[in-house]
Amino acid sequence: PAVSVGNVGQLAIDLIISTLNMSKIGYFYTDCLVPMVGNNPYATAEENSAELSINAEVYSLPSRKLVALQLRSIFIKYKSSSFCEKLLSWVKSSSFAKVIVLSSSHSYQRNDLQLRSTPFRYLLTPCMQKSVRNKIKSLNWQEMEKTPCIPEMSDSDYCVRIPGGGITRALYKESCSKEIQMAVLLKFVSEGDNVPDALGLVEYLNEWLQMIKPQSDDPAPSTLLWKIPSSWKLLFGSGLPPALF
C-alpha cells in the first residue's frame, strides 16, 4: 500500500492478509520508515498473539501466486524517494509479474467531473496496459484524470496529481520510466473512520483479482466475507476508562 490519507491502502492490505490467511515470509528492511514494533496484528489465538511485527513485512499466498507488502509506519523526512528506489529495485530483482498499489486521495480536492462520478480510480503504466487493457475495459472502471500541474494556471501542462496519496505518484512515475507493470487503485476519501473506505477499496480490487468469491449468486459486496483483523478492535484506542462515568 501507499501511506496515504486515511491509511486506506494499509487497512485494505490488512483485510487481504487476514481474509486469505497469508503467511508472513519475511521483512522489508529499510531505514526510510519510522521504527516501530508491536504484537501480531492478525492474532487468532493466545499462542500467536505474542509474535512481534515491525514497520514493513512481507506476506505470501503461494496457491494464488500472491505477495503482499504491509507498511505500518510513516516515512522519515526526505526518505520517501530513497524508499521508492529500494522498493522498485526489489520488485525487479524478485521478478514480480505485476505490482498493484492500493492508495487514496483527498476527496475535497476532486474536480466537478470527479464529484459526479464513482470515487474509485485506477492508473496503469504503459507496459501494464498491454497485458490487462481488455480486462480493465470489461470492468468499466474509470481512469484517473489528468489535471493542470499548477491548478491556478489555465494554460498549465496536464499531469496526474494525487493529493494526499503519499508516494503513489512517485512510484507510478518511476515504474513508467523503468517499464514495470504497475497498477494503482485508489479511492477519494476524507479522514475519519476509514474502515468503510478500506472495505470499498478491497472490493474494488476483488472485482479484478477475484481473491474471494461471493457466498451466493448475488455478487454484491455485502455477500463477500472479509475477515476483520483482531487488531482492529483497538483501531481508535482502548476505549474510555469506566472511571469517567
Give the location of each predicted region:
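Accessory terminal and edge-of-domain segments that mediate assembly/interaction
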Residues: 1-98, 107-245
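Internal, hydrophobic cores of structured domains that mediate oligomerization or house catalytic pockets
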Residues: 103-105
